[in-house]
Amino acid sequence: MDARLLEILVCPLCKGPLDYLKDKQELVCKADRLAFPIRDGIPVMLEEEARALAAEDVDALR
């Protein structure tokens, strides 16, 4: 994942910051508790493609 791209990407829903999970190839919005997949190096920033996270999963990221 390109570091410059990570600096400018925000959550498409709340416009908040995203955390990059390299091992899972996901971008996580803690505020909306969503994980957006990265496929073939390309972030898929569509709400319908995002994986919902449990509160415990988000807390583990803090």
From Swiss-Prot:
Domain of life of the organism encoding this protein: Bacteria
One Gene Ontology cellular component annotation held by this UniProt entry: cytosol
Database matches in Pfam families: Trm112p
InterPro entries on file: Trm112-like
UniProt record similarity statement: Belongs to the UPF0434 family.
UniProt cross-references to HAMAP family, sorted A to Z: UPF0434
Protein's UniProt name: UPF0434 protein azo1471
Organism: Azoarcus sp. (strain BH72)
